[in-house]
């Protein structure tokens, strides 16, 4: 599909523990995006430190790494037209208090430190995050039979 891009989405330990994995995947599927990579993992501290390297000088960095290491994470790669931008809209604001109802964080979160989900904020970030969490052979390229009903 022309102009298709990929994004990295991770359901954080609080989202996993609260049983929201299916609901989150359902929202991305119903929107029309295609799941091309999926892992259920206990992320290492080294992986998390690399993932959040841009935040390393922030006072909450060590707490964020500890929290993300506290339980399993669902790491995903989604593909589709404008999936990075649209995915961020679907997630809502980083601070759930600023998120609108109908967004994932607006519907399921209260505090910024437990905002259940991560989504790439740019195509460049998505490429970096995908390569950090997935090997190329772990991404599955296939044609969805629904594609012709979603895209012109």
From Swiss-Prot:
Co-factor requirement: Mg(2+)
Amino acids binding ATP: 12, 60, 88, 94, 105, 115
Listed Pfam families: NDK
Coiled-coil stretches: none
InterPro entries assigned: NDK-like_dom, NDK-like_dom_sf, Nucleoside_diP_kinase, Nucleoside_diP_kinase_AS
Annotated keywords: ATP-binding, Cytoplasm, Differentiation, Endocytosis, Isopeptide bond, Kinase, Magnesium, Metal-binding, Neurogenesis, Nucleotide metabolism, Nucleotide-binding, Nucleus, Phosphoprotein, Transferase, Ubl conjugation
EC number from the UniProt entry: 2.7.4.6
SUPFAM superfamilies for this protein: Nucleoside diphosphate kinase, NDK (SSF54919)
GO molecular function: 3'-5' exonuclease activity; ATP binding; DNA nuclease activity; enzyme binding; gamma-tubulin binding; GTP binding; identical protein binding; intermediate filament binding
Catalytic activity: a 2'-deoxyribonucleoside 5'-diphosphate + ATP = a 2'-deoxyribonucleoside 5'-triphosphate + ADP; a ribonucleoside 5'-diphosphate + ATP = a ribonucleoside 5'-triphosphate + ADP
Major site of localization recorded for this protein: cytoplasm
Annotated positions of the Phosphoserine modification: 120, 122, 125
GO biological process: cell differentiation; cellular response to fatty acid; cellular response to glucose stimulus; cellular response to xenobiotic stimulus; CTP biosynthetic process; endocytosis; GTP biosynthetic process; hippocampus development
Sequence position, cross-link Glycyl lysine isopeptide (Lys-Gly) (interchain with G-Cter in ubiquitin): 100
Location of the protein in the cell: Cytoplasm; Nucleus
Disease: This protein is found in reduced amount in tumor cells of high metastatic potential.
NCBIfam families named in the record: PRK00668.1
Family stated for the protein in its record: Belongs to the NDK family.
Quaternary structure and interacting proteins, as annotated: Hexamer of two different chains: A and B (A6, A5B, A4B2, A3B3, A2B4, AB5, B6). Interacts with PRUNE1. Component of the SET complex, composed of at least ANP32A, APEX1, HMGB2, NME1, SET and TREX1. Within this complex, interacts directly with SET. Also interacts with TREX1, but only following translocation to the nucleus.
Function: Major role in the synthesis of nucleoside triphosphates other than ATP. The ATP gamma phosphate is transferred to the NDP beta phosphate via a ping-pong mechanism, using a phosphorylated active-site intermediate. Possesses nucleoside-diphosphate kinase, serine/threonine-specific protein kinase, geranyl and farnesyl pyrophosphate kinase, histidine protein kinase and 3'-5' exonuclease activities. Involved in cell proliferation, differentiation and development, signal transduction, G protein-coupled receptor endocytosis, and gene expression.
Protein name: Nucleoside diphosphate kinase A
Lineage: Eukaryota, Metazoa, Chordata, Craniata, Vertebrata
Gene transcribed to yield this protein: Nme1
């Amino acid at each position: 599909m022309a102009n298709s891009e990929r994004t990295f989405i991770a359901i954080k330990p609080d989202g996993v523990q609260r049983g929201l994995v299916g609901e989150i995947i359902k929202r991305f599927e119903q929107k029309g995006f295609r799941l091309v990579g999926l892992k259920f993992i206990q992320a290492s501290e080294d992986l998390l430190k690399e993932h959040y390297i841009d935040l390393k000088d922030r006072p909450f960095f060590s707490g964020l790494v500890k929290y993300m290491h506290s339980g399993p994470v669902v790491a995903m790669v989604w593909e589709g037209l404008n999936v990075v931008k649209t995915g961020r809209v679907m997630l809502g604001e980083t601070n759930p208090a600023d998120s609108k109802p109908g967004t994932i964080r607006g519907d399921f979160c209260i505090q910024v430190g437990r905002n259940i989900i991560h989504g790439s904020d740019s195509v460049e970030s998505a490429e970096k995050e995908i390569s950090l969490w997935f090997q190329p052979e772990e991404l599955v390229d296939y044609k969805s039979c629904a594609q012709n009903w979603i895209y012109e």
